[in-house]
Amino acid sequence: MSNIYALEPHTNAKVILHTTSGDIEIELWGKEAPRATRNFIQLCLEGYYDNTIFHRIVPGFLVQGGDPTGTGQGGESVYEDGFPDEFHSRLRFNRRGLVGVANTGQNDNGSQFFITLDRADELTKRHTLFGRVAGDTLFNVMKMTELEIDENERPLYPPRIKRTEIVINPFDDILPRITEREKRQQKELEKKKMLEEAKKKKAPKKKQLNLLSFGEEAAELEPPSHTVEKTKMKSAYDFMETSAPTPTELIEELKKPVKEESTVISEKKDDAKQEEENKKAEEEERKRKKALEEERKRQKEEEKKKMQENTSESRASAIEKLKQDIRNLSKTSSNTSDELIPKKDKKRSLVELEREKYASQKRKKMKKGDDTDVFNKLMSFQKKLSTAKEDEDAAAAKRDQPPCEIHGIPGCESCRDTTQDAEEDVSDAGWISHKLIFEKDLKGKDLMKRRETVDDYVVIDPRDREAKAKQEEYERKKGIKSSSSSQRRDRMDHDDKRYRTEKRSRSDRHRRSRSRDRYDDRRR
């Protein structure tokens, strides 16, 4: 990463985006991408990005925002049309935290921007790179990838830019088209207009059909309107079941002359009688309905009981019929079967067997604490075992039997065919005298005592192998050296002998020549 930072040029502008996920510090390259940087700073000065959302999040790729409509289709630059692309040889999308301008095509840049989350070489030379996220604020950008997104890469709860702050502005000549205060006032006016328009919306006027010659027919054909008629608030008198007079009626009655009081009283009496009669009729109707309901319930219960009885009777009759059929079949089969076919016992159901089992257990159950009989039986059995003698005849018979072909053991029990033994001697007491004898435990394994010798284990130590290999290598080298030294010594001895012999022969020759010279001198 250090060499990547070394290749990138120095920044000369800085903007802080205060978002709901935390602050994001963006350093801008004003020299390398002047138009994109100027556009971004001027939009921040005008408060264009305030309360806008990051409408697109692609984990592992980018986070996109800067659209005031929040759809990804809006946004405009400070220039009249989209400004052209700005590429630089030292600026590439080769890591995360780089800020670029979003566009729909070549030289079609607006207000939307994106922040990369990983290396994206495919964006190089296609989108203008004009900034980078500085410091630990990059982790606030990475935090946005943890949000839930839908199929269209749109977050369900999108993060929002609350406001923007310009820390370093390299362009002194930037004049915002509208200040933040004016923009707030403009938004308030728009809200007021929207409210006024909503209030001005009136209900659709009713057609005056009575002015037409065929108004009555048109009124019949006209569908009922869904407008809610305004009604006055009702008092408690309107919801009373009795025909009690309302306060307005009482006032009108007071205003009437006294002569009409008698007629009014008589009318009230008639009304009271009528109400009493109506109440009595209603009570009788209720009683009659209750009686009918009770009668219906009783009939239903009786029908259910009859159905259950019928079903139980039918089931019992069906079971009995099946049993009778089975008996008949067994009789016919027994008559027609030969003597070779053995007679089968009568089949009983599992329920009957279980009942017999529990009944026998219940009969055999003894009283609590009465176990003397069991103890006596145990003692007699132990006595029988201790006094039992080995059946010598059986052992001798086994020894006399020929050895088996597989194991070579006389009287081998493994090779004996038990299926051919039609009758077994149940009274054979030879098993009592039999003894189970195991091999003597010499190592004391049953007592968990390890008495093994060292010779029982094979110790494989890799270090011994390594030491042995080193020793062999040393001896081999030593043998080579010793052989070479002995050869050298032999060669030296041989040379020494040869030199001595040559020297001796030379001295002998010299001595002979001197003696010859002396002899010649004497003769002369």
UniProtKB/Swiss-Prot annotation:
<feature type="compositionally biased region" description="Basic and acidic residues">
    <location>
        <begin position="487"/>
        <end position="505"/>
    </location>
</feature>
<dbReference type="InterPro" id="IPR044666">
    <property type="entry name" value="Cyclophilin_A-like"/>
</dbReference>
<dbReference type="GO" id="GO:0005737">
    <property type="term" value="C:cytoplasm"/>
</dbReference>
<dbReference type="InterPro" id="IPR020892">
    <property type="entry name" value="Cyclophilin-type_PPIase_CS"/>
</dbReference>
<feature type="compositionally biased region" description="Basic and acidic residues">
    <location>
        <begin position="252"/>
        <end position="308"/>
    </location>
</feature>
<keyword id="KW-0508">mRNA splicing</keyword>
<dbReference type="GO" id="GO:0008380">
    <property type="term" value="P:RNA splicing"/>
</dbReference>
<feature type="region of interest" description="Disordered">
    <location>
        <begin position="243"/>
        <end position="371"/>
    </location>
</feature>
<dbReference type="InterPro" id="IPR002130">
    <property type="entry name" value="Cyclophilin-type_PPIase_dom"/>
</dbReference>
<dbReference type="Pfam" id="PF00160">
    <property type="entry name" value="Pro_isomerase"/>
</dbReference>
<keyword id="KW-0963">Cytoplasm</keyword>
<keyword id="KW-0507">mRNA processing</keyword>
<dbReference type="GO" id="GO:0071013">
    <property type="term" value="C:catalytic step 2 spliceosome"/>
</dbReference>
<feature type="region of interest" description="Disordered">
    <location>
        <begin position="451"/>
        <end position="524"/>
    </location>
</feature>
<protein>
    <recommendedName>
        <fullName>Peptidyl-prolyl isomerase cwc27</fullName>
        <ecNumber>5.2.1.8</ecNumber>
    </recommendedName>
</protein>
<comment type="subunit">
    <text>Associated with the spliceosome.</text>
</comment>
<dbReference type="GO" id="GO:0003755">
    <property type="term" value="F:peptidyl-prolyl cis-trans isomerase activity"/>
</dbReference>
<feature type="compositionally biased region" description="Basic and acidic residues">
    <location>
        <begin position="461"/>
        <end position="477"/>
    </location>
</feature>
<keyword id="KW-0697">Rotamase</keyword>
<feature type="compositionally biased region" description="Polar residues">
    <location>
        <begin position="329"/>
        <end position="338"/>
    </location>
</feature>
<dbReference type="GO" id="GO:0006457">
    <property type="term" value="P:protein folding"/>
</dbReference>
<comment type="function">
    <text>PPIases accelerate the folding of proteins. It catalyzes the cis-trans isomerization of proline imidic peptide bonds in oligopeptides. Involved in pre-mRNA splicing.</text>
</comment>
<feature type="compositionally biased region" description="Basic and acidic residues">
    <location>
        <begin position="318"/>
        <end position="328"/>
    </location>
</feature>
<feature type="region of interest" description="Disordered">
    <location>
        <begin position="389"/>
        <end position="417"/>
    </location>
</feature>
<keyword id="KW-0413">Isomerase</keyword>
<comment type="similarity">
    <text>Belongs to the cyclophilin-type PPIase family. CWC27 subfamily.</text>
</comment>
<feature type="compositionally biased region" description="Basic residues">
    <location>
        <begin position="506"/>
        <end position="515"/>
    </location>
</feature>
<feature type="domain" description="PPIase cyclophilin-type">
    <location>
        <begin position="11"/>
        <end position="166"/>
    </location>
</feature>
<keyword id="KW-0747">Spliceosome</keyword>
<dbReference type="InterPro" id="IPR029000">
    <property type="entry name" value="Cyclophilin-like_dom_sf"/>
</dbReference>
<feature type="compositionally biased region" description="Basic and acidic residues">
    <location>
        <begin position="340"/>
        <end position="359"/>
    </location>
</feature>
<dbReference type="GO" id="GO:0006397">
    <property type="term" value="P:mRNA processing"/>
</dbReference>
<keyword id="KW-0539">Nucleus</keyword>
